[in-house]
Amino acid sequence: MNIVVVGLSHKTASVDIREKVAFAPTQMEKPLRALLAIEDIAEAVIVSTCNRVEVYISTRDIAGGMARIKRFLADYHGISPEILEPHLYAHHGEAAIRHVFRVASSLDSMVVGEPQILGQIKTAYGYAAEFKTSGIILNRFLHKAFSVAKRVRTETKIASSAVSVSFAAVELARKIFGNLSDKTVMLIGAGEMCELAAKHFINNGVRGVMVTNRTYERAVKLAEEFEGKPVSFDDLFDQLHKADIVLSSTGATQFIIKPKDVEEVIRRRKLKPMFFIDIAVPRDIDPKVNDVENVYLYDMDDLQGVVASNLQQRAEEAKKAEAIIDEEIGQFHKWLSNLEVTPTIVALRSKFEETRKAELEKTLASWKDLPPDGAKRLEALTTAIVNKLLHPPTATLKRVGQGGRTDLYVDALRTLFELQTGESEAEELGELEE
């Protein structure tokens, strides 16, 4: 049995293509059952996020499985195969295992190290388990992917540093103030960057958030998201002294905060330190503000420097993660190969043993003058012959199993000797390997 992965991601398809092939998370039963109804697809899992759509299957027919998934994606979403095909990638065997392990470990994410993708794959697996479209192979495969991702997070620092400007701003604030639990943040602007920064500050336990914007309604809307306080733009400097951290990102063409403004604010704060973060381009805050006593000002260049340094650190950590994945691929591939090989070896030996016993019984029944130890000696002789005959094919199967190329040998033996290997044998092996 083979694992096949077909999909597309932010690396291969624009958002307008990705949204056309996305699956609604609350309506996964229909597509999952449709996949299982397709010829030669034994198990199926669908992962659908804003940045990727992937289908994982187990099948005996690699090329056919890939083609059928591609056709399924096009037909199910009503997209021309000619339009969809250029954006799709397809993997099988070790490449498929590596791909999913990397995805689960966030090495293939838009932001390397982000934690969301692992939860999204777990959710996808949950749907497959609920609707019984995953079985022994994909169950084991995805549980292994989860454990690999955990190892990567535990044994590397891939998720420990900021790689977005908004998160870098929070990281700098923590370096200056340490604990943020008694700090209040003022957001000047209500755009995407301010919203992201607000989320990071809230996640780091700030005491409160104030939001101001030239359009007061937008300030109210963003403040409501974080149980914050909206501030009229006209009241900015009346309220600014209440903020320990000020993050500004507006579309202004001139400075909106100048040194004289901040000097007055600091006096009202009785010289308590303030941290200003200017992520606007053009800048919102006059650089000379940094000269005011007990004021710390950082702009986009400062933050980009933090991000660049952290990206380099993550690149180094990613190398360690790849080494972990290499190690885990070998272990899983061995299990997958043995899943095919072991039941076949058991069935082959059982077939030979049944034949040996049947023929030996016939011989013993018709042998009139059998010596006293004759039956014992014939038992040993026939057993030795069977073992010698079976040693070469058994050794070969085990060897090719370690190399990962088992299907041709397994299929040949099953056909030549008319072997029957039940699903229970495979399940038993799976349980023993857990």
From Swiss-Prot:
Site annotation Important for activity: residues: 99
GO BP of this protein: protoporphyrinogen IX biosynthetic process from glutamate
E.C. designation(s): 1.2.1.70
Keywords: NADP, Oxidoreductase, Porphyrin biosynthesis
Pfam families xref list: GlutR_dimer, GlutR_N, Shikimate_DH
Reaction it catalyzes: (S)-4-amino-5-oxopentanoate + tRNA(Glu) + NADP(+) = L-glutamyl-tRNA(Glu) + NADPH + H(+)
UniProt pathway annotation: Porphyrin-containing compound metabolism; protoporphyrin-IX biosynthesis; 5-aminolevulinate from L-glutamyl-tRNA(Glu): step 1/2
Class of this enzyme: oxidoreductase
Residues involved in substrate binding: 49-52, 109, 114-116, 120
GO molecular function ontology, one term from the record: glutamyl-tRNA reductase activity
Active site: 50 (nucleophile)
Residues engaged in binding NADP(+): 189-194
Note: During catalysis, the active site Cys acts as a nucleophile attacking the alpha-carbonyl group of tRNA-bound glutamate with the formation of a thioester intermediate between enzyme and glutamate, and the concomitant release of tRNA(Glu). The thioester intermediate is finally reduced by direct hydride transfer from NADPH, to form the product GSA.
Family: Belongs to the glutamyl-tRNA reductase family.
PANTHER family in the cross-refs: GLUTAMYL-TRNA REDUCTASE
Domain comment quoted from the record: Possesses an unusual extended V-shaped dimeric structure with each monomer consisting of three distinct domains arranged along a curved 'spinal' alpha-helix. The N-terminal catalytic domain specifically recognizes the glutamate moiety of the substrate. The second domain is the NADPH-binding domain, and the third C-terminal domain is responsible for dimerization.
Biological function: Catalyzes the NADPH-dependent reduction of glutamyl-tRNA(Glu) to glutamate 1-semialdehyde (GSA).
The protein's assembly and partners: Homodimer.
Protein name: Glutamyl-tRNA reductase
Organism: Geobacter metallireducens (strain ATCC 53774 / DSM 7210 / GS-15)
Source organism phylogeny: Bacteria, Pseudomonadati, Thermodesulfobacteriota, Desulfuromonadia, Geobacterales
Gene that this polypeptide is encoded by: hemA
